[in-house]
Amino acid sequence: MLCIAVFAIIPQKECTPERMEADFRANHQKIEMLIRITRSWLPDSTGFSVEYSKHGKLTDWGVSSKQEVNFQGVEIGSQKEQEKELRKIGLSLERLDSVRLALQKMDYRGLSINKGGAISDYTEIVYGKTGNKEFNYRIYDKPLADSLVYKLNRCYNLIVYNRYVVFSCVEDFDYDSLFPGKYAYLQKHTLSK
C-alpha cells in the first residue's frame, strides 16, 4: 500500500508598516463604510467586537453594553437563541455574516467598535496575525492632538499613520513589544515630508 501526503503551506500576510499602509490606502473607503454601517446597527452606548479565522469561522466575539446580553464564548446555543441575544444590541446572524464577508473581501480578520475610550471612540480592524503578534488599524472618530501623536509614536508598539489612524502591534505576552520596522518607517516618512 502506498500512501502519499501533501502539505500545503499557506503564506502569512506580511505585517510591515509599509504593507499595512498600502492595504489601508487600498481599502480605506470600504473600511469606513463597514464601520459606518456596523455602528448604525448598534445602540449608542454599545461596543462590539468580532473575530474570524482565516477560513471565516467565528473565533471570538464580545459586547460592552448597558443591555444584558447572554453569550458564552463563541457558542451561545441554538440559532434561535443566538438571534434573540444579537437582536438586543441591533445585530442578527445575517448582519454578522455581512460583517464577516466584508472583512474577508479585504483579507482582514476582525472588527472591534470601542465606545467611551480615554481619547475618543475608535474602531479596531484586525489586519493580520504573525506568530504571537496581532496587527491592527485603530481608527479614531476625532483627530488626535499633536501632543497625543507624539506620545503614541513614542510607544514601541504603535505607529501614527495620520491624525485618525494608528497602526498597532500587540504581542500575546508582551504589550510593549516593538512594532517590526517601526523606526525605519517613521524615519522614511519624516524625510519625505
Language model features with spans:
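N-terminal export/targeting and maturation segments
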Residues: 5-94
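Extracytoplasmic electrostatic interaction patches
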Residues: 87-193
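N-terminal Sec-pathway targeting helices
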Residues: 1-3
